[in-house]
């Protein structure tokens, strides 16, 4: 079965996500692979594909802050902390928020927090809006290989039948910056 998705085929991508599949799509800097954050089956597939241990935790990417609220606890943020986050969103900055006990461990790993981002990539915004929630998002690359920056690189690493939402990345050279939402501490330079 050929799962390659034509440009703009958001409906086909949503159908695959509903079936607990992992898909690839362009983000601000590189292609990402993602899945339904509420499906342990889908997340397990993604972790196996990436050869990534569950205890490392994952990132959620969303079209809006509202989509992220069920997975994080922003109640302890001050007005200044909230402003610092929203000054960067939508955009290529990921923030680590406290996570409520209801957030699945397959997302948070060994942490009591979760990394989240409101993207400004139009294709990912459309995908998250059509799906109605955020996606787990991690760089599209197999262990030890560089992140994919084109559809062709995704196909070379994951195979011709791997489902890819075709489109261009946002042109950034580096993956998203990661910061602590409470302290502003920089975890990864963007």
Swiss-Prot record:
Organism: Salmonella paratyphi B (strain ATCC BAA-1250 / SPB7)
Subcellular location: Cytoplasm
Family from the record: Belongs to the SUA5 family. TsaC subfamily.
Enzyme Commission numbers on file: 2.7.7.87
Name under which the protein is recorded: Threonylcarbamoyl-AMP synthase
Domain of life of the source: Bacteria
YrdC-like domain residues: 7-190
Keywords: ATP-binding, Cytoplasm, Nucleotide-binding, Nucleotidyltransferase, Transferase, tRNA processing
NCBIfam families: PRK10634.1 (NF007919)
PANTHER family recorded: SUA5, THREONYLCARBAMOYL-AMP SYNTHASE
Any single Pfam family the record assigns to this protein: Sua5_yciO_yrdC
GO biological process: regulation of translational fidelity; tRNA threonylcarbamoyladenosine modification
DNA-binding keyword on record: no
Function: Required for the formation of a threonylcarbamoyl group on adenosine at position 37 (t(6)A37) in tRNAs that read codons beginning with adenine. Catalyzes the conversion of L-threonine, HCO(3)(-)/CO(2) and ATP to give threonylcarbamoyl-AMP (TC-AMP) as the acyladenylate intermediate, with the release of diphosphate.
Parts forming coiled coils: none
Catalytic activity: L-threonine + hydrogencarbonate + ATP = L-threonylcarbamoyladenylate + diphosphate + H2O
HAMAP family with a match to the protein in the record: TsaC
Stored Gene3D superfamilies: DHBP synthase
GO molecular function: ATP binding; double-stranded RNA binding; L-threonylcarbamoyladenylate synthase; tRNA binding
PROSITE patterns, A to Z: YRDC
One of the record's GO cellular component terms: cytoplasm
């Amino acid at each position: 079965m050929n799962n390659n998705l034509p440009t703009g085929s958001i409906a086909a991508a949503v159908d695959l996500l509903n079936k607990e599949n992992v898909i690839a799509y362009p983000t601000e800097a590189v292609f990402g692979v993602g899945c339904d954050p509420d499906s342990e089956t889908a997340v397990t597939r993604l972790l196996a594909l990436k050869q990534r241990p569950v205890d490392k935790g994952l990132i959620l990417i969303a079209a809006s802050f509202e989509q992220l609220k069920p997975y994080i606890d922003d109640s302890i943020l001050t007005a200044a902390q909230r402003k610092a986050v929203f000054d960067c969103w939508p955009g290529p900055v990921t923030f680590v928020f406290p996570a409520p006990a209801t957030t699945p461990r397959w997302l948070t790993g060994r942490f009591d927090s979760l990394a989240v981002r409101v993207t400004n990539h139009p294709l990912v915004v459309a995908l998250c809006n059509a799906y109605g929630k955020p996606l787990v998002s991690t760089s599209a690359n197999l262990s030890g290989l560089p992140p994919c920056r084109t559809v062709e690189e995704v196909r070379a690493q994951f195979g011709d039948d791997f489902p890819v939402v075709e489109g261009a990345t946002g042109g950034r050279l580096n993956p998203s910056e990661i910061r602590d939402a409470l302290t502003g501490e920089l975890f990864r330079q963007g």
